[in-house]
Amino acid sequence: MKLKVACQLVYELKENAPLILMLRPQNGLEQQILEENFVLTPNIPVSEYQDVYGNLCQRMFATLGKLTINTTSIVETQAHVEVNFDAGFVPVENLPNEAIIYMLPSRYCESDKLFSLAFEITQNLPLGYAQVDAIRQWVKTHIVYEYGRSSSSTSAFDIVQTKTGVCRDFTHLCLALCRALNIPARMVVGYLHDLKPMDLHAWFEAYVGDKWYTFDATQNSATGNRVVIGYGRDANDVAFASQFGDMELVNMWVSVEEVK
C-alpha cells in the first residue's frame, strides 16, 4: 500500500534555541520512501545525523519567533504484519548483539519490577511469539485507553497501578513485560493508517524466532499500513522533538492518506 503521511509542527520561541527533531520516516526493507519534502519556515539551516538506533535526526538552531515545520512523505509499506505463533523464544546466548540492549530495563520500562506479572500472564504458553501476543492481549484488555490520565513521566510500573494511558503507555508496559521474560522488545514510533483520532503513534516489536515481529496493544488485530519513523528502548529515545530552550508547541497536525 502507498501512504501519504504528513506532519506539521508550529512553535513559538521566546529565545534562540537548539531543537532536534525526529520526523523523517526510515527507508528500508519493510518500507520504501518514494517522495519526501521537509520544509522549515523561516528557512533556517538544518543538519542531519543518524543516532545509535539508526534513526534520522534533524538538528537546527531555531530563532526567536514563530517556527513552522512541514514534513510530507509518500511511502510504500506493508498492508499486513506477519503473524507467526511458531516463532520461538531465542536464548540469550543466541541473540544478535544489537538485540541485547532491548532486553534490559530502561527509563520508562522497569522490567525488573514486573517479572511476577509477566509470568502470571504467560504461564503454560509456548515460549516466544505466543507469550508476546498474550502480553499484548492482556494490556489491551486490562488497561483503559484514556487521554489526560498519564504524563511524560509516567512509566510502565505506574500504568500497572493506574490502569489507564495512551499508546505510549500501552507500549511501555508491553516492552517491560516482554523484557521481564528475557524477550528483546523495542518501541516503534510513526504513522498508522486509519488511526482515530489521528496522531503520531507508538507500538512495539519483539525479537522471537530470529526476527522482529510487530505488535500493537491499542489495536484489536495485527494491522499493517504503518510507516516507521524511529526505534528505541522507550519514549526517551524516540521523541519527535527535543527542545533546549524557551519554546512552546502551539499547534500539531498529522495526516495519513492512502495513495491510489
Predicted feature residues:
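Hydrophobic/aromatic-rich core segments of domains that either
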Residues: 137, 169-246, 253
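Glycine-rich, flexible loop/turn motifs
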Residues: 45, 91, 141, 155-156, ...
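Secondary-structure boundary elements
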Residues: 75-79, 97-165, 173, 235, ...
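Ordered, amphipathic secondary-structure segments that act as subunit-interaction surfaces
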Residues: 77-92
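Short N-terminal helix-initiation segments at or just after the protein's N-terminus
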Residues: 7-17, 144-152, 199-202
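Intrinsically disordered, low-complexity N-terminal segments that are enriched in acidic
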Residues: 1-81
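Flexible glycine-rich active-site/ligand-binding loops centered on an Asp-His dyad
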Residues: 28, 88-104, 155, 222, ...
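Short clusters of hydrophobic/aromatic residues that line enzyme substrate/ligand-binding pockets
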Residues: 46, 145, 160, 215, ...
